[in-house]
Amino acid sequence: MTTLTTTPRADGFHMPAEWAPHSQTWMVWPERPDNWRNGGKPAQAAFTAVAKAIAQFEPVTVCVSAAQYENARARLDDDNIRLVEITTDDAWVRDTGPTFVINGRGEVRGVDWTFNAWGGFDGGLYWPWQRDDQVARKILDIEGCKRYRTEGFVLEGGSIHVDGEGTLITTEECLLNRNRNPHLSREEIEAVLREHLAIDTVIWLPEGLYNDETDGHVDNFCCYVRPGEVLLAWTDDQNDPNYPRCQAAMRVLESVRDAKGRQLIVHKMPIPGPIHASEEECAGVDAAEGSQERSPAVRLAGSYVNFLIVNGGIVAPSFDDPKDAEARAILQQVFPEHRVVMVPGREILLGGGNIHCITQQQPAPQGA
C-alpha cells in the first residue's frame, strides 16, 4: 500500500482512544526460545487464552510463522480468530504493529514507527530486530491501509496512551531515553507526536514501573479509562522501589490539565507481588548472545494496568495473587458498562510484558 509523505494531522486523521469501537485486535504468536521458556509452549497457552477471551467481544487476527502455523491453528480453534502468516522476531505487537489513525470519513490508516527492540545496541533486548520493524507495514498491507512511516524516529505503542480528545500520556524514562531518539529534544519529540497522532497536550510522567525492561512503558503503569480519568499503578509501601515512582507520577497527574483544560481524576490500582521468576522458569529459557538474561533475583514488573479495552469488555491479567480480586473490582468499578475477564498473565510477564503489550487494537472506521 501507499506510503504517504504527509502526516496524519495534516490529512485530518487522529489516534482514537482505546475504548473507541474496534474492527479487530491483532496479536503475534510467541515462539522465540531465548525469551519464552520451554520453546514457547507455556506462553502459547497463555496467548491462546488471551486470544479466546478477546474473541468473545471482537475478531482477532494472530500473526504466526510458517513453522508454527499448524500448531497455532489447532490451538486457536475459534471462529472469531483468523491466522495470517507473518515472519517476526518476537510477539510484542503493541510495540511492533502500527498505531492506527482514523478520520471522520470512514478511513483507517496506520503509523509505522521505527522499532529498535527497546534500545538498539544501547540496552535493547534482542538483535536482530529488522523483521519486527517490518511488522507494522505487513499488517497495513494485509488490511489495505495507507502508511505513514517515521523513518529514524523510534517509538513503541506501549509507550503512549491517548484519551482521543487531544491528550497523550507517556514517560520521560522511555521517550527521553538516550537509546530511543537522542538526536531530538523533548519539544521535538512532542512535535512528532502532535503531527502523527493529532494530539495537543503531552503529559510527561517521570518514570514507569520499577524494573520494566522496556525503560518504563506507560501502558504498564498508567492508562486512561475515559477522558479526564486515569488509572495509576500504586503502592503505599514506602519500602517498595515503586513507591517514589508512584508518588512522582501522582504529583504530575494532580498538577496538570489536559487538552480540554480538565484536572485529572486519578484511580489507584494496587501493584501485585512482588513477583519473581522461579529457578525452573528461568532455566527453561534458552541462552543466546544479545538476548535478555532471565534471573530469579530480578523482580518482575507485574501490573494490573496492563489490560486491553475491547468492544464491551476488559481483558486483564491475573497473577494468582491476593490482590487479583481487588483488581477485578476496581476495573469493574471504573468500567461499569464493560464485562471484565481476567486471564492468567504470569507466563506473559515472564517474557517481559502483559496483555496490553501483546495486543494492538484496530479501530473501526468512523463516519461515511
Swiss-Prot record:
Active site residues per record: C357
Pathways involved: Amine and polyamine biosynthesis; putrescine biosynthesis via agmatine pathway; N-carbamoylputrescine from agmatine: step 1/1
Native source organism of the sequence: Ectopseudomonas mendocina (strain ymp) (Pseudomonas mendocina)
Tree of life domain: Bacteria
A GO term, aspect molecular function: agmatine deiminase activity
E.C. numbers: 3.5.3.12
Entry function: Mediates the hydrolysis of agmatine into N-carbamoylputrescine in the arginine decarboxylase (ADC) pathway of putrescine biosynthesis, a basic polyamine.
Cystine pairs: none
Reactions catalysed: agmatine + H2O = N-carbamoylputrescine + NH4(+)
Gene name as annotated: aguA
Keywords noted in UniProt: Hydrolase, Polyamine biosynthesis
SUPFAM superfamilies, per the entry: Pentein
Family: Belongs to the agmatine deiminase family.
Biological process (GO), any one: putrescine biosynthetic process from arginine
Classification via InterPro entries: Agmatine_deiminase, Peptidyl-Arg-deiminase_porph
Stored NCBIfam families: agmatine_aguA (TIGR03380), PRK13551.1 (NF010070)
Subunit (UniProt): Homodimer.
Name assigned to this protein: Agmatine deiminase
